[in-house]
Regions:
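Charged alpha-helical signal-transmission linkers that cap and connect PAS-family sensory domains
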Residues: 108-111, 128-129
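PAS/LOV-family and closely related PAS-like sensory domains
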Residues: 46, 58-100
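PAS/PAS-like sensory domain cap-loop motif
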Residues: 36-49, 110
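PAS-family sensory domains and close relatives that share small-molecule sensor folds
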Residues: 92-94, 103-109, 120
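Sensory-domain boundary/capping and coupling elements
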Residues: 9, 128-139
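Sensory modules in modular signal-transduction proteins
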Residues: 4-39, 82, 139
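PAS-family sensory domains
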Residues: 113-123
Length: 139
């Protein structure tokens, strides 16, 4: 089938159905997009998460550092590490602290104005704990 006859990709379905957590927060840090992967990872339904501060999934001891980095990225229009994946902590609805591999991107409109931040996340808890156990056994 020629590609010029294909309709545009169904981005909303892709975002909704991808296994990884996809989250968008606006410039004030309010959750505006939350897919099924985010529901599975953090335990909050979209109805529970949308409209809430992203503090919902950030452990209390990491919130100040998060907000410093977020505000810097919003002012600068870019994250300090680009789209590099980093392992950080997340907070599940049941109170468990997770290890989460996350990448972030500042989202801008067509005129270059910063709209907020998008994050892609994946559970890294099992891998992180296995690495810790290997280090402890080796050392």
């Amino acid at each position: 089938m020629p590609t010029d006859t294909l309709s545009p990709p169904p981005w909303e379905r892709i975002v909704a159905d991808v296994a990884d957590a996809l989250i968008f927060i606006d410039g004030a840090g309010v959750i505006r997009a939350w897919n099924a992967g985010a529901e599975a990872l953090f335990g909050f339904s979209a109805a529970q998460a949308l409209g809430q501060s992203v503090d919902l999934i950030i452990p209390p001891h990491l919130r100040a550092a998060h907000w410093r980095g977020f505000e810097h990225a919003m002012r600068r229009g870019a994250t300090s590490r680009g789209a590099a994946v980093r392992t950080t902590r997340g907070l599940h609805q049941d109170g468990r602290k997770l290890y989460v591999d996350m990448s972030f991107a500042v989202v801008k409109d067509a005129d270059g104005r910063v709209l907020g931040s998008a994050a892609m996340a994946r559970d890294a808890t099992a891998r992180y704990l296995a690495e810790q156990a290997r280090r402890a056994a080796a050392g």
